[in-house]
């Protein structure tokens, strides 16, 4: 909705990493191992990808970050780079709900169609509605991995709420 209303791109570090993984790039292979274990890809890699992306022409009138920044170092790097943010939104969801939503997700790899075992189940359990092919659970959607990711969030990302609430001056979200 926001991207369409303002004619700006959504910048998702997760999507960028998944594309690198799918392409089998060295970054993608390194990222896959870290993500599958529930960890976060190194800040320098993410920051470099984001800086490169926001320098592209379609970002000249703005952009919407999705899932970025995730660490204090990433947030500080964006401020140091002179990137002004108009707003920062925190969506607060209980861990139990996140675990349920993510671990219930199933994907048809060839098309990208996404289902959920409870909220949007396929007509036939474990099968894509269109092709009848198998659905998979991504490694990063497995319950234990989601719980590890949440622990990392609480340790590394929650501090951003405080960081942005205290940010003053020209780089503070308006």
Swiss-Prot record:
UniProt feature coiled coil, ranges: none
Residues binding ATP: 105, 114-115
InterPro entries: Adenyl_kin_sub, Adenylat/UMP-CMP_kin, Adenylat_kinase_CS, Adenylate_kinase_lid-dom, P-loop_NTPase
Region of interest called NMP, as start-end residue ranges on this chain: 12-41
Catalysed reactions listed for this entry: AMP + ATP = 2 ADP
Residue sites binding AMP per the record: 13, 18, 39-41, 67-70, 74, 138, 149
Gene3D superfamilies for this protein: P-loop containing nucleotide triphosphate hydrolases
Entry keyword annotation includes Thylakoid: no
Pathway where it operates: Purine metabolism; AMP biosynthesis via salvage pathway; AMP from ADP: step 1/1
Pfam families registered for this protein in UniProt: ADK, ADK_lid
One GO biological process term: AMP salvage
Cellular compartments per GO CC: cytoplasm
EC number(s) stated in the UniProt entry for this protein: 2.7.4.3
Region LID, residue ranges: 104-141
Homology family: Belongs to the adenylate kinase family.
Role summary: Catalyzes the reversible transfer of the terminal phosphate group between ATP and AMP. Plays an important role in cellular energy homeostasis and in adenine nucleotide metabolism.
HAMAP family referenced in this protein's UniProt entry, alphabetically: Adenylate_kinase_Adk (MF_00235)
Oligomeric form and interacting partners: Monomer.
Name of this protein: Adenylate kinase
Source organism of the structure: Neisseria flavescens
Source species taxonomy: Bacteria, Pseudomonadati, Pseudomonadota, Betaproteobacteria, Neisseriales
């Amino acid at each position: 909705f926001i991207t369409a209303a303002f004619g700006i791109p959504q910048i998702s570090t997760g999507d960028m990493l998944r594309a690198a993984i799918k392409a089998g790039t060295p970054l993608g292979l390194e990222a896959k191992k870290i993500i599958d274990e529930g960890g976060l890809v190194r800040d320098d890699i993410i920051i470099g990808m984001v800086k490169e992306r926001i320098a592209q022409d379609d970002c000249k009138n703005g952009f919407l970050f999705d899932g970025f920044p995730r660490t204090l170092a990433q947030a500080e790097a964006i401020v140091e780079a002179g990137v002004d943010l108009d707003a920062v939104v925190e969506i607060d969801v209980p861990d139990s709900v996140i675990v349920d939503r993510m671990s219930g997700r199933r994907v048809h790899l060839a098309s990208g169609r996404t289902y959920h075992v409870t909220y949007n189940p396929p007509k036939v359990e474990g099968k894509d509605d269109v092709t009848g092919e198998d659905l998979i659970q991504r490694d990063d959607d497995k319950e234990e991995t989601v719980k590890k990711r949440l622990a990392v969030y609480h340790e590394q990302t929650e501090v951003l709420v405080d960081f942005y609430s205290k940010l003053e001056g020209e780089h503070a979200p308006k």
